[in-house]
A protein has these predicted regions:
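An N-terminal assembly and electron-transfer interface module characteristic of large anaerobic redox
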Residues: 1-178
């Protein structure tokens, strides 16, 4: 993603949200628009790799390791909900990762994470689409509209990333010439 200036969409959800029938084919919609999607269970786990994104937090003792979420959620009881919070923290630190946050059936275990995840992603300005209660009514048409709107947002975000990279490169080149 970084090498190609691509945006990857990280799915925050329960294991069943990877099922097209349960996620109303929302991942397929994004893939048909050219976006790669990644389940939070497939996100990087290598500590050396993760330290480039969590080094300051560890150095300042906000957390003990890149996997620690106690700085934002001290008492967590659900493994899956804790994984969602950690994945949001990772996405907030990686400029090429956007988030799709799904929940179904007013999931009680995930309810405590809604505000935490929203705060993490909002503070970092990480592009994110939240589809809570995805099974409410018959969301097919409204989901397609939201997917296309979010895809446009991601395209604009990707352009800004590319422009920033180009500006940084040009600045370095100019400084080397002086």
């Amino acid at each position: 993603a970084v090498a190609n200036d691509e945006i990857v969409i990280l799915l925050l959800g329960r294991p069943y949200h990877s099922d097209p029938g349960l996620n109303h084919e929302v991942l397929d919609e994004f893939q048909s628009l050219g976006f790669k999607t990644l389940s939070m269970r497939a996100s990087p786990k290598d500590e050396v790799y993760l330290m480039q994104y969590f080094k300051e937090d560890v150095d300042f003792d906000y957390v003990e390791s890149p996997y620690d979420i106690r700085d934002v959620w001290a008492e967590n009881f659900s493994t899956n909900s804790a994984q969602k919070v950690w994945a949001a923290k990772f996405a907030a630190r990686h400029p090429n990762v956007a988030v799709l946050d799904l929940s179904s059936f007013k999931c009680g275990h995930d309810a405590p994470t809604y505000a935490i995840i929203d705060k993490i992603l909002g503070a970092s300005r990480t592009p994110h689409l939240t589809l809570h209660d995805i099974d409410a009514n018959k969301p097919g048409g409204s989901i397609k509209i939201r997917v296309k709107t979010f895809a446009y947002t991601l395209e604009q975000y990707q352009k800004r990333l590319t422009d920033q990279k180009r500006t940084t490169y040009n600045t370095i080149q100019e400084e080397m010439r002086v």
